[in-house]
């Protein structure tokens, strides 16, 4: 009997070992990782480009409504969806949490092979405290509001309320704890946006009694230590402001930063950053997903802080946020302005990778996605309102008639399809620094990029038969001494040698094609009229040009593979 028991035990142990070997190990938690020249979002062990879209603020409050949205989202070729979760949706009664909605959103995303980024609408959404639970709204004594210079309170929780901070943190950590339990092994959720466009609207700073007392106290030493240690890398306008007041290493907010509304804005940025840092740390202790904020950008009509949310992580105060909230991984811009190239440059910094959680989804949005990812090593792009993508349709010139009613034909859908094909190539090039991009308009019709052994001249497309398009865009990847992959729409491209040797570049071979599972599949060979930009050979030769280059039309974006040669 003893031998029989030992034999059975051995068999059971062997079966258990075999079974455990067949269970796949849980994928690593999504995280940010510095790889060469880029900081990238790593998902399932590989760099991930978030070809994303954000739903309307309350779309995600109804699973029934989302059932109508998921199929549309899939047709636009997204791989990631940003969805809001309101504090009041999950904690309607204090201490009683209901994550049914969260589980339903996870299930919906998984059924459609999508990943999620949750947006925690807690203490603040668009500057206001409109998503806090009713029991918070009703108890102003326990959860005090900010006050304006006119003496009136606003529907904005004070950043200095410990009760508000603790209540929001408890709910947020319960949410993160639930995500860890519900998503371990699946990794559907990639990142968390903490709050939404924080900042005080209506005044440059909180004028409540606790806030006035805090403003009169000295600037916290940890902020001044950060500014001193990072002085060479500070945003130029912030450094100028600090130095204009004497670059003091101690003093009150007005003594250190001057008597202006900008000092008020810096004060508010510090208070918001400390509040969110506390929450982010607590959430990461439960489940360490990357965390980012989003910024309501200063609009052309805005004059002073308070016209826009004062304290929001604008370019001027991002350094304040880096000092006050080290647990926040990214300060991201919501770019609802048409000069995307300017704003992406302001937010992409060595300590701040570019992610755009809100912007346009039309043709301009397609160009934004290419430019942010290609020029600024962006980890993703996300237009707002993806649950209703019909309004992103491209119109025929001079009409209100869509070019196509099919969601798959939207400019963003086409752009995302190409970016998805090229993701392994792009993320590798981001790390190597062998990638660039162009975002062109009739006002900014050309961009030159030094890449590899050539300067790549990218112009908005011009020909005799058609008007100049309003917008053109391209991504260029160098893959060898004389070899490039280019994807774009409504652009034309010349290559100019910038290394010793023959001074004129010719096209050895050009082909269209596509990537399938990371492998290039050539299509047709391109030559003749499809590459000639200048038939006047004397004029071209005088400029050290062959007169031939790459041409991308309005049917794009498309991908071309080019090999060059040089001659005297």
Regions found by a protein language model. Name each.
Residues 22-78:
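N-terminal carbohydrate-binding accessory modules
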Residues 52-61, 84-100, 150-170, 256-273, ...:
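The substrate-binding groove and active-site-proximal loops of carbohydrate-active enzymes
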Residues 59-75, 309-324, 343, 369:
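Short, acidic/polar
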Residues 65-139, 272-286:
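Aromatic-lined substrate-binding rim segments of carbohydrate-active enzymes
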Residues 142-318:
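Polysaccharide-binding and catalytic clefts of secreted carbohydrate-active enzymes
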Residues 278-289, 316-421:
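Catalytic-core region of carbohydrate-active enzymes that cleave or remodel glycosidic bonds
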Residues 370-501, 512-517:
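Aromatic- and carboxylate-lined catalytic core of secreted/periplasmic carbohydrate-active enzymes
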Residues 458-468, 484-568:
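C-terminal beta-sandwich/jelly-roll accessory domains of carbohydrate-active enzymes
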């Amino acid at each position: 009997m003893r031998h029989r028991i030992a034999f059975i035990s051995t068999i059971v142990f062997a079966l258990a070992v075999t079974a455990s070997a067949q269970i796949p190990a849980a994928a690593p938690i999504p995280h940010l990782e510095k790889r060469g020249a880029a900081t990238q979002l790593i998902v399932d062990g590989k760099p991930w480009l978030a070809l994303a879209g954000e739903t309307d603020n309350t779309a995600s409050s109804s699973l029934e409504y989302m059932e109508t949205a998921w199929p549309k989202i899939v047709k636009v070729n997204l791989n990631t969806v940003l969805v809001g979760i309101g504090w009041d949706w999950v904690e309607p009664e204090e201490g009683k949490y209901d994550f049914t909605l969260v589980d339903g959103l996870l299930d919906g995303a998984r059924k459609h092979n999508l990943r999620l980024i949750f947006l925690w609408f807690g203490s603040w959404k668009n500057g206001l405290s409109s998503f806090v639970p009713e029991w918070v709204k009703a108890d102003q004594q326990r959860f005090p509001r900010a006050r304006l210079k006119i003496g009136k309170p606003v529907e904005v929780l004070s950043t200095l309320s410990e009760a508000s901070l603790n209540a929001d943190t408890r709910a947020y950590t319960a949410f993160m704890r639930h995500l860890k339990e519900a998503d371990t092994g699946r990794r559907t959720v990639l990142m968390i946006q903490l709050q939404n466009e924080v900042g005080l609207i209506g005044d440059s700073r909180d004028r409540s009694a606790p806030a006035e007392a805090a403003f009169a106290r000295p600037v916290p030493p940890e902020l001044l230590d950060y500014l001193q240690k990072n002085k060479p890398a500070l945003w130029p306008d912030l450094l100028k402001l600090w130095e204009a007041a004497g670059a003091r290493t101690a003093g009150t907010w007005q003594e250190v930063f001057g008597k202006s509304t900008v000092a008020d804005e810096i004060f508010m940025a510090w208070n918001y950053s400390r509040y969110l840092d506390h929450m982010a740390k607590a959430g990461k202790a439960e489940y360490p997903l990357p965390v980012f904020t989003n910024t309501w950008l200063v609009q052309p009509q805005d004059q002073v802080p308070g016209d826009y949310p004062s304290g929001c992580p604008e370019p001027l105060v991002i350094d304040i946020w880096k000092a006050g909230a080290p647990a926040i991984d990214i300060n991201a811009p919501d770019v609802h302005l048409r000069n995307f190239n300017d704003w992406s440059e302001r937010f992409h910094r060595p300590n701040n990778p570019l992610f755009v959680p809100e912007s346009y989804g039309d043709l301009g949005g397609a160009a934004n996605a290419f430019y942010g990812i290609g020029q600024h090593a962006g980890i993703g792009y996300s237009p707002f309102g993806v649950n209703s993508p019909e309004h992103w349709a491209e119109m025929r010139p001079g009409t209100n008639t869509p070019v196509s009613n099919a969601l798959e034909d939207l400019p963003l859908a086409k752009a995302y399809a190409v970016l998805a094909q090229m993701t392994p190539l792009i993320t590798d090039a981001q790390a190597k620094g062998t990638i660039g991009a162009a975002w062109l308009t009739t006002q900014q019709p050309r961009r030159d990029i030094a890449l590899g052994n050539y300067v790549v001249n990218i112009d908005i497309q011009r020909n005799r038969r058609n008007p100049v398009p309003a917008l053109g865009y391209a991504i260029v990847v160098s893959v060898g001494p004389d070899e490039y992959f280019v994807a774009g729409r409504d652009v034309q491209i010349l290559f100019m040698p910038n290394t010793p040797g023959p001074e004129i570049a010719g096209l050895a071979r050009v082909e269209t094609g596509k990537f399938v599972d990371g492998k290039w599949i050539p299509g047709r060979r391109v030559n003749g009229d499809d590459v000639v930009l200048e038939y006047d050979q004397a004029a071209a030769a005088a400029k050290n040009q062959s007169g031939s280059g790459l041409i991308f039309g309005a049917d794009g974006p498309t991908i071309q593979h080019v090999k060059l040669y040089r001659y005297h």
